[in-house]
């Protein structure tokens, strides 16, 4: 290898030129890098929905869900298919494997659409859809709420729509959605008795409305002066027009307003709602286009919303619900502050251990390496976020190693009397090759996360390129720039040659080494014993795949029984609202989503499908302590004040999302069997002392009334089952009869009975059914009976499936999930054929990610072994070097247990990085031993002299790495990795 240090010193002007270029380029690149809180990762999921009004959940499953699911099984790269089927509605989730290439995802979704269209012709008449959503991973980082105490829902919607249109013009905005909009209808409600006494069939009213509102061309007349279009009046312009509509029956003509109440009001049952601090609101959710600058977008939105607030009517307010740009700015600021602290710590180590001038050389190298890293990050499109900044901090503890080793060797040679030029060039010949090998080995330690699949690896994908770039640049700087700085800065007092290793400390260290070598059998056995004790203690380390974040948001989900109305859910949400108002001193703001879940305002939040029996609160606390206090208050209230719903509290995750810490999926061929086994698993989970809020995600039946029609009587009255079904649907739920056009909106005109008539179950049998000879009560042609039916059926890969879910004591995480799963072993061994119990959620994600992470490990080992062979040239020495790496587990286990840290995904990455660092130091030491042996020393003397020679640089680099990790130890995400490395 050509002496790059000599080249640098002979062409100093060129080197100084590139130093300036990279320094300036680094500043510009840092200012231009995109900012994010978390790195993006692809959610490989498509959501398919379909509706069949009037169908039971069982009919929906058999006639719609099953047919679609079976066809979707042909999807290439399929991981799993899950579905939620309710009465009249199905939602199917198609998930792809994590190893499906990003470029194949869109073509795969096209295949799914084609599969669905193939099945469409086999679906029953009346099925609406299927519809496809392959943008399930859109993140709405900025959410606003429009409120106004004295304004109607329609006025709030109109104001929010105006805000939406204004925001769409902002650069980098991709999509703006309204949330919690209450649609309006024109309701034509007629009393049951009036309908029966007049003998007017609802179909007559429907037909009259439909024929009146039809928009048809009136024709046009060509004249010498141009074309004149004919516009024929007749469509409804106002409610009075509808009231004046003539209805003919039995030779008589009535005005519709005389026999029915006609009103314009919000849809009933209501649409999913949004509330801000307990007040009705319409939300505005904003997503950013790919590649946009979120901080620039935040500034643009801040300016625009300030102007929009001034334009709103008096008494109407625009509130900021979620401000991702501000969160990102705060997160980046905290990480940059941590990086600055780490730099100060590393510099302090350098100055204290090497002296002012030598330490200054190292200090000058650090910003140069960081600047070069920023330039490369900008070129590769790597943004500043939690992972890339964490990688920089990790790299910081490593990148100073090469500079310290180079300048330390240069200082030693200067102390031995060499000139500055010769000392610098000698440092290259002695250390450059082993340093490069060690650097490449350290980079190779991150190969598993770089080339493995899975959301976790995708989340941490920036680790390998950022650390690799930083370490390679640090080697280049250490052999070309550090010697140049050292040439100008390092001075040795006096001109007399002296041995820097003839101090009392080194003499003591020599005696210790001599003793260890003389008693090497005892040392080796003791080391092996400690190593195996560490392995035995390893299972006692806590297991948590990804920890919760320190964001102030608290997510609270309320789930009522299947079949519960939106009004019941609203009542339960109002109780929680009252509790939050009592603790307003701990809250910045809170938002309630009734009948729906929050939009995905953070990538790690997993939205749920709309359901009338579900509500979700997003509570922004004033700090993490207040967040913890609120969670405790709400959990206590779940047993006393919120007994009508299942209450679940959750913090935002720092990695891929999971709904609950404990999730076990039970699948079986029948719904009865899956319920039976799920109840047993639930009992096992409840017996674990660490669990709380153990429940099944569906099991209870929904209430229903069965209407058994008498076919003979139907025939006698000239009716069909279809006639009766349509009539009941019209009278009870309301059928759309026509449309009303107002401004840019189209409102449906719905015909139904009055509220008193359609909600009284006791009078259901008296509902009038029109016949050719007049109306008859329903119970004259049918028998009514109460029954319980499946309100919800969930399936996983075509089988009925129930999820056993539970919260756990803080800090338990995957430990509790694994413990509960192991406790089901006896039950699993005795399950009937086709019935399974498998882990899901975080535990399954951890297993999948670790399996993916392990796959590239053989390649990593091969690369490390190859590098070692090129360096040491001996199988024995290569094996010796590799054997030093596992000894790092001794310190890892001790540190993790003492700090009570959890062994999760990032901690395993830290262990791999630690192995690379240990091997790196071993390479440099063995290379030094080989040089001493080549100079004629006996192996024993070569070992001792090399260890003495390498002690200071190894100790300094270790101290820099350990102390550089200190700021990260207090970070909830990177803390376990920092503990493992340090």
Q: Where do the model's predicted regions map?
A:
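Flexible hinge/switch segments at interdomain interfaces of large molecular machines
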Residues: 35-46, 83-89, 126-149, 177-183, ...
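Transmembrane alpha-helices and their membrane-interface boundaries in multi-pass membrane transporters
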Residues: 396-410, 431-451, 458-497, 617, ...
């Amino acid at each position: 290898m050509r002496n790059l240090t000599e080249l640098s010193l002979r062409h100093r002007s060129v080197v100084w030129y590139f130093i300036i270029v990279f320094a300036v380029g680094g500043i510009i690149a840092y200012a231009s890098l995109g900012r994010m809180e978390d790195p993006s990762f692809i959610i490989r999921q498509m959501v398919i929905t379909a509706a069949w009004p009037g169908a039971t959940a069982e009919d929906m499953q058999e006639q719609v869900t099953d047919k679609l699911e079976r066809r979707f099984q042909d999807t290439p790269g399929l991981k799993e298919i899950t579905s939620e089927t309710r009465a009249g509605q199905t939602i199917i989730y198609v998930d792809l494997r994590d190893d499906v290439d990003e470029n194949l995802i869109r073509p795969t979704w096209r295949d799914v659409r084609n599969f669905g269209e193939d099945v469409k012709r086999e679906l029953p008449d009346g099925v609406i859809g299927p519809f496809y959503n392959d943008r399930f991973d859109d993140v709405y980082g900025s959410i606003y709420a429009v409120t106004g105490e004295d304004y109607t829902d329609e006025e709030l919607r109109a104001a929010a729509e105006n805000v939406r249109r204004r925001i769409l013009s902002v650069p980098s905005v991709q999509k703006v959605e309204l949330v919690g909009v209450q649609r309006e209808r024109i309701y034509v409600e007629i009393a049951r008795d009036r309908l029966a006494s007049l003998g007017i069939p609802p179909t007559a009213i429907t037909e009259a409305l439909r024929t009146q509102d039809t928009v048809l061309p009136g024709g046009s007349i060509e004249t010498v002066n141009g074309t004149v279009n004919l516009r024929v009046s007749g469509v409804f312009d106002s409610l009075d027009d509808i009231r004046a509509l003539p209805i003919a029956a039995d030779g008589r003509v009535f005005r519709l307003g005389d026999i029915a109440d006609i009103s314009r009001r919000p849809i009933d049952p209501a649409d999913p709602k949004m509330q801000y601090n307990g007040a009705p609101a319409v939300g505005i959710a904003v997503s950013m286009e790919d590649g946009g600058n979120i901080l620039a977008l935040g500034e643009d939105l801040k300016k625009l919303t300030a102007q929009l607030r001034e334009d709103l009517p008096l008494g109407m307010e625009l509130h900021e619900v979620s401000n991702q740009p501000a969160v990102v700015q705060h997160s980046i600021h905290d990480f940059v502050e941590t990086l600055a602290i780490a730099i100060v710590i590393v510099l302090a180590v350098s100055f204290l251990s090497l002296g002012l001038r030598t330490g200054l050389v190292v200090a000058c190298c650090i910003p140069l390496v960081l600047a070069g890293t920023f330039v490369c990050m900008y070129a590769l499109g790597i943004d500043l976020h939690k992972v890339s900044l964490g990688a920089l901090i990790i790299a910081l503890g490593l990148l100073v190693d090469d500079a310290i080793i180079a300048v330390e060797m240069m200082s030693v040679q200067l102390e031995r009397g060499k000139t500055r030029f010769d000392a610098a060039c000698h440092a290259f010949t002695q250390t450059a090759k082993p340093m490069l090998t060690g650097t490449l080995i350290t980079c190779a330690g991150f190969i598993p996360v770089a080339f493995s699949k899975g959301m976790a690896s995708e989340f941490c994908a920036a680790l390998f390129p950022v650390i690799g770039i930083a370490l390679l640049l640090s080697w280049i700087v250490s052999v070309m720039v550090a010697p140049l700085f050292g040439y100008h800065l390092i001075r040795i007092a006096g001109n007399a040659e002296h041995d820097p290793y003839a101090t009392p400390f080194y003499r003591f260290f020599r005696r210790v080494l001599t003793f260890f070598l003389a008693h090497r059998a005892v040392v080796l056995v003791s080391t092996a014993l400690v190593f195996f004790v560490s392995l035995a203690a390893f299972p006692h380390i806590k297991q948590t795949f990804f920890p919760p974040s320190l964001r102030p948001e608290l997510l609270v989900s309320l789930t009522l029984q299947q079949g519960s109305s939106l009004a019941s859910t609203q009542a339960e949400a109002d109780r929680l609202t009252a509790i939050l108002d009592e603790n307003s001193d701990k809250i910045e703001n809170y938002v309630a989503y009734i009948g729906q879940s929050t939009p995905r305002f953070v990538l790690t939040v997993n939205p749920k499908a709309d359901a009338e029996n579900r509500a979700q609160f997003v509570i922004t606390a004033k700090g993490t302590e207040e967040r913890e206090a609120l969670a405790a208050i709400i959990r206590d209230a779940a047993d006393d004040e919120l007994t009508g719903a299942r209450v679940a509290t959750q913090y935002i995750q720092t990695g891929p999302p999971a709904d609950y810490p404990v999730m076990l999926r039970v699948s079986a061929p029948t719904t009865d069997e899956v319920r039976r086994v799920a109840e047993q698993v639930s009992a096992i989970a409840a017996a674990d002392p660490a669990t709380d809020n153990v429940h099944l995600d569906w099991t209870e039946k929904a209430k229903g009334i069965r209407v058994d029609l008498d076919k003979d009587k139907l025939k006698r009255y000239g009716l069909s089952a279809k006639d009766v079904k349509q009539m009941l649907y019209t009278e009870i739920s309301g059928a759309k009869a026509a449309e009303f056009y107002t401004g840019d909106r189209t409102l449906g005109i719905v015909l139904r009975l009055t509220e008193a008539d359609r909600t009284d179950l006791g009078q259901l049998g008296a509902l009038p059914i029109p016949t050719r000879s007049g109306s008859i009560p329903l119970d004259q042609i049918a028998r009514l009976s109460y029954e319980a039916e499946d309100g919800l059926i969930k399936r996983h890969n075509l089988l009925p499936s129930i999820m056993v879910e539970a919260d756990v004591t803080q800090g338990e995480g995957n430990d509790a999930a694994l413990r509960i799963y192991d406790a089901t072993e006896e039950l699993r061994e005795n399950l009937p054929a086709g019935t399974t119990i498998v882990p899901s959620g975080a535990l399954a994600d951890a297993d999948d990610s670790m399996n993916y992470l392990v796959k590239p490990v053989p390649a990593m080992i091969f690369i490390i072994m190859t590098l070692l062979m090129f360096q040491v040239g001996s199988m024995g020495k290569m094996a010796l070097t590799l054997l030093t790496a596992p000894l790092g587990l001794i310190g890892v286990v001790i540190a993790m247990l003492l700090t009570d840290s959890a062994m999760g995904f990032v901690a395993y990455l830290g262990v791999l990085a630690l192995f690379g660092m240990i091997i790196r130091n071993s390479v440099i030491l063995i290379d030094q031993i080989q040089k001493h042996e080549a100079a004629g020393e006996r192996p024993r003397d070569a070992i001792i002299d090399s260890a003495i020679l390498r002690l200071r640089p190894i100790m300094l680099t270790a101290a820099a790495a350990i102390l550089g990790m200190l700021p990260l130890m207090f970070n909830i995400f990177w803390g376990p990795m920092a503990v493992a490395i340090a």
